[in-house]
């Protein structure tokens, strides 16, 4: 088979490298948190493969690009009989394809649903093989971090192979190279089972291309939540074709700037002129991305939205380009150049030939343009009421004509000067900016001194981006019993302008009404608590908050979905998933810690009216204990310990980095209350806190280390895993290592023997409490576990990581007596798949059915 694969590849190697076009799709297999898995066949032979398809845009939006690389690297480096083999890592402009071996036996979770639970011998063999796989990974500096029955596949012979390394951690601070693939330390002389063709090796060491211009724009807009220029850009991208320019022209015709109405709208919007204006801009987009100063202040405040595929105009286009190249009317009502408005547009070939000549004409046109801009601002100072870009400037602002000679027209270097020109080029109208009062303060800044203080955000601006509150006004919060606190909050704060406080006031009134309509069965949900009790609550909750699932993605797509603040935007995200699919994702949504990274503790102590955004959420002790606080939505797919066989379906989807889950998933879990942190005043009256991040960061909602409890967290260690299988050190905010996998193995052993995870409960909060309290419901009576099996579980589920068992301790344990560790892959397995044919995927259907997952779609 391998010889045929090599011959097939060698015959085409002179033509092209391996491509996804070399495969033919057979059928879908399953669906996970980040993509779908398909059964496919290679065109040149009959060998079957399992292809995992992941969209690049989704990984960028979820801040999971590093995890995508980690999964590919972990599979490429692993050459073990107990780990799924990766053949190819292919990609297109929008998707990544991991071509792996197809294991026809399905996953252990499906088998567990069918069996109910495994007997002791069956559990012993499965756990032994998984233990060897974990030991192999740990010796190669790979932490799986998502070990669960769902990610254990059964081969044709019935053996176990680990898969789904999407949450793994690989200690490889560089790109894979040829030697990493060919010389795995444990296999100096690789056997033919791990032989890779040249095309396979080439695909495995290639870059995943997650930093393309299209994706880069999305990366900035997803992470720079606090940037005043990033809000509302979704509209510009959705309407793509020069949207800010088209709006500007239309508003210009209706504004006082246009003293004469001589120019007809069709003379500006003609298709000929539109095509003429876009061509040179697109030619420049690639060069601009290559030369932009990444470390500059303005790169952070004004991230690139250049998207060559969507024809989005760059935010830093200079004044001359917008008026000369695009033939936009001057601010005083005159045309830029009557000759150019009458010229016949050039073809793309002619434009490229004449481009140097056009570039030489930039400077002569620049000076009169700036004079016109300056004069128009002096003549009409009252335009701030109509348009943001013509607002009043600082008296110390440098005139534009003084900065023009320093502007480099031919390149894309970003300097402070172009920001001044920006105000009269592509700024949107006042009524188009959702958060106008807050953004106006930054938009009016014109001098260098103002931008030297760019990270010291004004008070109103820091409260402008409301993150979560916009979501809760759309998603029903039936169980929120906080109407008195909301009413008190509204009475204390009431600015008349369109500010975040007013917005929050309206939103909390809606929550108040919904809370009253949702029932009054929880009289204990009072808001009167002594300061001492609140400190205890904050302490207990902060222990569960930091490095656990609490840093989930309640804010994953916030900049894109909340910029419009319309129900249509969010409702469309829910329409993509039916109720069953939402129920499969919902258990991943959990409380978040969403405090800004660059705010000090002193800044967080403020007036009571600032509690909506700057303070965490105070919760009374009775509220935490009340059934209403812990009551899940109907779609939350958690089962009780005493329910039927399907009760253990809580572990179905891998929880991504909890800074990066989809908004639809997190919004569907309405009980997500943010835990209270240390060093916070007790006068916080809001139940939800909105992040106010203002700088580019891969983890923008990370709590400042100054308020963390426990040891300082290791750098670059996001919170990953599935609720039932999370180790306590993750919930306690401590640095974690490979011992988290051994904890998860103990959870799996308990689940194999009983049919349900040991810490399973109705809500994620209760699951976390069970883990931290090590509350294990041991079966009794006829279902009681043997002493050896129970002790094996206990040494794996040890709270102290230094005392937790590993492979060495398991080999010496009485429960594993008689296990031939050196020949596990030759032992007879208790279950051997008997498929109807080679394309049979029925062994995967049990888990899909139990978790209400529907797999559809046949497009790669």
UniProtKB/Swiss-Prot annotation:
One of its GO terms (molecular function) is protein phosphatase 2A binding. Residues 817-860 form the AGC-kinase C-terminal domain. Serine/threonine kinase that plays a key role in M phase by acting as a regulator of mitosis entry and maintenance. Acts by promoting the inactivation of protein phosphatase 2A (PP2A) during M phase: does not directly inhibit PP2A but acts by mediating phosphorylation and subsequent activation of arpp19 and ensa at 'Ser-62' and 'Ser-74', respectively. ARPP19 and ENSA are phosphatase inhibitors that specifically inhibit the ppp2r2d (PR55-delta) subunit of PP2A. Inactivation of PP2A during M phase is essential to keep cyclin-B1-CDK1 activity high. This is Serine/threonine-protein kinase greatwall. It comes from the Eukaryota. One of its GO terms (biological process) is cell division. GO terms for cellular component: centrosome; cleavage furrow; cytoplasm; nucleus. Pfam families: Pkinase. Residues 514-537 are annotated as: Disordered. Belongs to the protein kinase superfamily. AGC Ser/Thr protein kinase family. The active site is at residue 146. Keywords: ATP-binding, Cell cycle, Cell division, Cytoplasm, Cytoskeleton, Kinase, Mitosis, Nucleotide-binding, Nucleus, Phosphoprotein, Serine/threonine-protein kinase, Transferase. It catalyses: L-seryl-[protein] + ATP = O-phospho-L-seryl-[protein] + ADP + H(+); L-threonyl-[protein] + ATP = O-phospho-L-threonyl-[protein] + ADP + H(+). Residues 23-816 form the Protein kinase domain. ATP binds at residues 29-37, 52. The keyword Membrane does not apply. Phosphorylation at Thr-722 by CDK1 during M phase activates its kinase activity. Maximum phosphorylation occurs in prometaphase. It is found in: Cytoplasm, Cytoskeleton, Microtubule organizing center, Centrosome; Nucleus; Cleavage furrow. The modification Phosphothreonine is found at residue 722. Coiled coil: none annotated.
